[in-house]
Curated annotation (Swiss-Prot):
Listed Basic residues bias regions: 30-44
InterPro entries: Ribosomal_bL34, Ribosomal_bL34_CS
UniProt cross-references to Pfam families, sorted A to Z: Ribosomal_L34
An annotated GO BP: translation
Keywords per UniProt: Ribonucleoprotein, Ribosomal protein
Source species: Rickettsia conorii (strain ATCC VR-613 / Malish 7)
Entry protein name: Large ribosomal subunit protein bL34
Ranges in coiled-coil conformation: none
Spans through the membrane: none
Family the entry assigns: Belongs to the bacterial ribosomal protein bL34 family.
Gene: rpmH
Any GO molecular function: structural constituent of ribosome
One GO CC term, this protein: ribonucleoprotein complex
Keyword Glycosyltransferase on entry: no
């Protein structure tokens, strides 16, 4: 059986990267929450 996690840096950046987060209102809300919490790393 094939494993579910097949790592790819390109897909990782496209799906969870900073620019993709900024592209939607919900994504911006996520970044805002993470800034408020004081996360060192905001996105992938």
């Amino acid at each position: 059986m094939k494993r579910t996690f097949q790592p790819s840096n390109l897909v990782r950046k496209r799906r969870h990267g900073f620019r993709s987060r900024m592209a939607t209102p919900t994504g911006r809300a996520i970044l805002k929450k993470r800034r408020t919490k004081g996360r060192h790393k905001l996105s992938a």
